């Protein structure tokens, strides 16, 4: 039976968010997809049904750019399909503005945009290096007031507030291959009277969206956020989106600083407990290195409707990924690496890997929960020592699904049961004594940011163990023995998320033996080449 669903597919470079409207819901649904010219279908991870919106929705991930896909949903006897083409990584440019090489102390204001048929590119003149250094005498290096604009290869220094300001409602802006440093006011706790919170390398005002922020080096703001010993951190941020229109991709950036010039959030925004927020909907955050944050490395809070966060390396932070709230969902957090977490300069105890939370707001006189969206948390690897103390924060949590994660933590793994709708946690490795042994031996040594699983690991075999050595019986108490790595081939199959596993079952954690490792940071971007600010010295 073919039903006339109202269907919608919203692509990015490597993902498609899909929406199939169905007034009553027809029970659990199945999703499958294929390249439009292919014969073989692939199974996707099942969608969720949201009775509030009367629709099935979910995401397909790991897709190829600039490729047409056919997506089919089946719910009971009902079936519907839609075609969608992922974004091309090549932007058609019909107007180019070359900025004269050298140092400029004037704000660049972009008031002329392009269109869907052709973008307006702003870049240094060929063979030159353009530096905007406004010496803290202007609030911004660049102000974007038009749609379909590309900023490429610029060096932006010493903005008084935000280095790049994207005005309210502006859409379709690409910021790529830029170096941004030294922006913002002095940070610090609000109880000290400091008001310079959220000064950002890239700041998008409400309603802006469809932003691509990629391959940038964002580092060392002028000020620094306070740590938790003086209250909630407040200070500079790398990227901030305020009540975005959605459709954003933030990928392959390196966002870093020092502890004394640390960020509040690396990637963040607002409004948190809302049905909009940052990045709001149909957005991807992947391939980034984010560090030196006193609150959240990645803050994805608000609607989180078909938001995907994957393959990020996160360290020197308090919270790795913040998700309070996830009002609509689904939010997918998968194959990230969670490194060092700390509370303050003095307290290295650690925060939490995933912040949750919700509240109730009044909409048209109705009390509405902001905590009913699904969170899918798959195949992440948490490192120790000095990683997050707890996996989840202690806030009320519903509709969280966790699978195949290495959650090495010294504190609480899962939050208390808050009743219906319930969470679903399974096939994770949790605790501070994983596998009953020496956790470091679980991973193969590497000089790169990768943590593939060793086939075997060391563990303590408790008790008195006798063995034959040289014809004699020798008894050893609590010997260290080699044992099978408990993360190898121990995961659950998750269609669309781990189809390419190479063993008897998927490995637990972010790295699958026999497959390429996730790569992080701007230099890991496919086809990466150095920008003029690196080559024209």
Identify the residue ranges that each predicted region occupies.
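Structural beta-strand segments of beta-rich domains
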Residues: 14-18
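Predominantly extracellular beta-rich ligand-binding scaffolds that present long acidic/polar faces
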Residues: 308, 314, 330-477
